[in-house]
Amino acid sequence: GSVRRGIGSAVVRQLLAWPLPAARTELMPTHAQLRAIIAADPLRMRCLAHVRALALPDCWVAAGFVRSAVWDHLHRRGRSALPADIDVIWFDRARCDAAVDAEIEARLRRADASLEWSVKNQARMHLHNGDRPYRTAADAMCHWPETATAIGVRLSEEGEIEVAAPLGLDDLFALIVRPTAAFRGRKRQVYLDRLAAKRWSETWPDLRIVQG
């Protein structure tokens, strides 16, 4: 399946600390590498704990939260700053009103006002994106622009880091920016405009950009 569990994050934190030397992870399977990178970052672990406390269904912290951590690690950076917005996704067809997302964002700000939170119930986002209704949060991620963006993590009740990677982790760890299927076709220009706006290569020069 697309959800993988790792060893307990408390154990990982005893073994690893940020910055995490790439040589210590390069022989691990990619799911284990990702869990180790996230577990070694105290700020990201704090974010995951805040989100777990909400007890939302099918809920993940995704996109740049994961992507930039891995890219920074592979660029041998000493630390990985959080993205401007921390993308929290969840899936519940019974609570599709945008006001519910706004209230969840307010709860997260009360928990940690130093962070910028963005909460989106993926059960309604197909309307915004012009797609068929999504079935799960992972299904929604398959309709995001890049394969390396379509990845989420969360903390289980047991403190394990779980990974949702419906399109796999290969591109993320190969430093490849590649459009997903929809963004190779009718949404290709959206992908190209996003590349121009993000200017990722300026921050991560080892990236290989696929133009679509």
PLM ranges: what are they?
Residues 15-212:
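Catalytic cores of the polymerase beta-like nucleotidyltransferase superfamily
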Residues 2-11:
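Extreme N-terminal basic, low-complexity initiation segments
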